[in-house]
Amino acid sequence: LYKERASEDYKKVVENALSDARNIEKLSNGLMDLAKASYNTEQISMSAIRLDEVLLDASAMVMKAHSGYNVDLRFEDDTEDDEMVTIRGNDYLLRTAFVNLIENNCKFSSDQSSTVQISFSKHKVLIRFSDTGIGIPEEDMEHLFEPFYRGRNRDFSQGNGIGMALVERIIKLHKGAISVYSHHDKGTVFTLIFDYLQSD
């Protein structure tokens, strides 16, 4: 009985150590990404990229990392027009931002799901990341994009307070806009707006 107990305790210590190591790695990667997103556009490699392809990659990464998460991607028919989903940007940074938004949707929703929709309006491409989760408390909204700020929902899920600050910096680096609408116990919607590339 003692040996079984000792084995269980040892296993728990190892699991906790691995969990701590993963959290430290995630924090370290987040800090490096935050620093990179603070560069100006001349310091970042930019090229023409399709947002729908980056979204597909991001959703696949999230579902591979979290088997219980579900991502529902919804594209308008006009997505077949390459120009309308193409912007000048950095593939890695945008994918990082999209992964953060999708994971946020999933981890704060009881059904662990995120709905991502691409739409278009007057040379703009809009991407909405929505969930039906617990929502963001009103008093936390003004601090949402502050680095290391963790709001009243911090006990609901683990995090380091870097994700939303990183997302905002990446979107601004791409000359985009980000807004958020949230309703208690009904969900949250993050909306990104970018200018798409137009032919000369």
Model-derived regions: residue spans:
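Short alpha-helical segment of the dimerization/phosphotransfer core of two-component systems
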Residues: 19-24
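Short helix-loop "hinge" at the ATP-lid/N-box region of the Bergerat-fold HATPase_c
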Residues: 105-106
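Acidic ATP/Mg2+-coordinating residue in the GHKL
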Residues: 131
